[in-house]
């Protein structure tokens, strides 16, 4: 029988790799908590109709990339390809009108059938932040600043913020009329994929990565030139407030987001730290999505960060594990029982305590403690068990023992004093 393997585009995250993941997630969640943003959790599996209505039938995500199947009840179900539509559905279903202003975050696996590459898998993990009910430019600026600060806190270098305005629905309709005329005249200059989009989702052509099409688009109408005075004012205010916060940005009038629901502010944060420019974070305003999905008219803005790419870019220092505080070496029936009881007591001090369960010789257990670079060890053998005491030994940064003490199992005061001086105060 052939060995079973994971599916292409999925990855096993092993303990050593997860050290960096957990450190990154810890920093991210601390930043979100400081900004008073609350978590929301939605199902991984949703009705397919949610994404058709929410993301847009003509998008690549819906037409090419979704994992969709019929369940036993003949219902069309889809593994979520992104989080915003699910959050919108959850808010509508659970009564958004009772709490119209919310700042929410989510984190979890998403699924898209794409070509796997570094930092992008078919099952990938995404952090999303959504500000629901907020219409002011200040909310746009705050969410951009939050994304910028999270990436900076993680030590990601060479960050670039690109911004654009997609205007409101009327602006886009006016642009689309002019753009469609241009597309019909210049159809032969476009790649086949873009030609197929002309009657389905013409705005997505602006985001084409095909060099032939990108060259042709240099002479196409620009959406920014069709913005109303009101939309221009909003965009100008956005730039002014980013300048006040000293967040550098580049205007990119060709920047459109890959999903249909965006309006007004669109932004991406990229980094060249991996050698070529890679998008780390993307977001924008989606004032029409919740109404489009059957809810009340509700403005909103959000962003998403792919965690796989974030892990690749985050600082090397986040790969360093926290060393074990105490490694308990034990041998003998009574000693093993005492060691287990002591390990539970020590963990109440918020220490990393590893109890050796191998039953190996003392020398092998000492080697394991040394390999883990444990800050200290406790030794309990037959003699210590008979005397109802244990040896605790502290190591310096070079791994040399520099303090040793014998403590009775019943002397909690002495144990706590030793821990405070040698481990808890570090």
From Swiss-Prot:
Alphabetized CDD domains for the sequence: HisRS-like_core (cd00773)
Any GO BP annotation: histidyl-tRNA aminoacylation
Entry EC no(s): 6.1.1.21
UniProt keyword annotations, A-Z: Aminoacyl-tRNA synthetase, ATP-binding, Cytoplasm, Ligase, Nucleotide-binding, Protein biosynthesis
GO CC term (a single one): cytoplasm
Complex and partners: Homodimer.
Protein name from the UniProt record: Histidine--tRNA ligase
